[in-house]
């Protein structure tokens, strides 16, 4: 459960990420595909090379979903409901991949904003990413 402090911390991160969200989304995917090659299996039709237009486009979607969740932090389930349906019913992505994506997003934020990611903010952002992963897999059951 996200505390009031967690919510403030998460909103602060997304305020800083701001205009770079799309680039961070693409970088997050590139890191995930490199560090966890098994995640590539869901993207057999993608050009997975650095700077690929497909990774950039999907990174934009990932970033938009995270921003949407942060903007509706009191109703993450509602904000991600359609995306949860898509991943559970059509795409059938292994739920562990959302945790891997969350970890890679934390790394990207840490690289670009090292002073922002204090231990407290890190914990809050990790809890937020876990909440996002939980909602994206909620309809698998």
From Swiss-Prot:
Q: Which UniProt keywords apply?
A: Heme, Iron, Metal-binding, Oxygen transport, Transport
Q: What residue ranges are annotated as transmembrane?
A: none
Tell me the function of this protein.
Involved in oxygen transport from the lung to the various peripheral tissues.
Q: What is this protein called?
A: Hemoglobin subunit alpha-A
Task: Spell out the family assignment given in the record's similarity comment.
Answer: Belongs to the globin family.
Signal sequence coordinates: none
A Gene Ontology cellular component where this protein is annotated is: haptoglobin-hemoglobin complex
Expression by tissue: Red blood cells.
Matching entries from CDD domains are given as: Hb-alpha-like (cd08927)
Quaternary structure?
A: Heterotetramer of two alpha chains and two beta chains.
Which GO BP terms, alphabetically?
hydrogen peroxide catabolic process
Return the Gene3D superfamilies for the record: Globins (1.10.490.10)
Q: What residues does the Globin domain cover?
A: 1-141
Keyword rRNA-binding listed: no
Which residues take part in binding heme b?
87
Recorded GO MF terms: haptoglobin binding; heme binding; iron ion binding; organic acid binding; oxygen binding; oxygen carrier activity; peroxidase activity
Tell me which Pfam families the record gives.
Globin
Residues that hold O2 according to the record = 58
